[in-house]
From Swiss-Prot:
Record's GO cellular component terms: cytoplasm; Holliday junction resolvase complex
Subcellular location: Cytoplasm
Gene it is expressed from: ruvC
Subunit note: Homodimer which binds Holliday junction (HJ) DNA. The HJ becomes 2-fold symmetrical on binding to RuvC with unstacked arms; it has a different conformation from HJ DNA in complex with RuvA. In the full resolvosome a probable DNA-RuvA(4)-RuvB(12)-RuvC(2) complex forms which resolves the HJ.
UniProt-recorded name of the protein: Crossover junction endodeoxyribonuclease RuvC
Cysteine disulfide partners in this protein: none
Gene3D superfamilies, alphabetized: Ribonuclease H-like superfamily/Ribonuclease H
Taxonomic source organism: Thermosipho melanesiensis (strain DSM 12029 / CIP 104789 / BI429)
């Protein structure tokens, strides 16, 4: 089973693809979708949508895991990230993929055993759990791998 994990954003959206076979979870790829600040928000959403569809077609995941919005101090940022999430949800639905959401607390708790871990702890554990040579960069890609890991270890899979 292939899982694509998403750390939503509109400037930088992280993704990570894992494969689960029995009890083994393997890293396939990770990266980010970036959008140019000079583009209108509509065009930025279009870039996210088209690039995400390309990833879905290239890696053919069986499921998608996405981090849910939890809390943002900046309302404008929360709205923009919510719009980017909406584009991901639409593309996932169009490809008829099951979608699973995890809160930041669930992701941290699942990866480190402590729901209030900081980013560096999560990144180090992602590196260790996936047997990677180095911590995935940028941070958004490491976060997306952590989200995918959460789904991979769920009992329903």
């Amino acid at each position: 089973m292939k899982i694509i994990g998403i750390d939503p954003g509109y400037g930088i959206l992280g993704y990570g693809v894992l494969e689960k076979s029995g009890n083994k979870i393997s890293h396939i790829t990770h990266g980010v979708i970036t959008t140019d600040k000079e583009l209108s928000m509509y065009k930025r959403l279009q870039v996210i949508y088209e690039e995400f569809l390309r990833l879905l077609k290239e890696y053919s995941p069986d499921a998608c895991a996405i981090e849910s919005l939890f809390f943002y101090k900046n309302v404008k940022t929360a709205i923009r990230v919510g719009e980017a999430r909406g584009v991901i949800l639409l593309a996932t639905s169009q490809m008829d993929l099951p979608l699973y959401e995890f809160t930041p607390y669930q992701v941290k708790n699942n990866i480190t055993g402590y729901g209030h871990s900081d980013k560096k702890q999560v990144q180090k554990m992602v590196k260790m759990l996936l047997n990677l040579d180095k911590i995935p960069r940028p941070d958004d890609a490491a976060d997306a791998l952590a989200v995918a890991w959460c789904l991979a270890v769920e009992t329903r899979f």
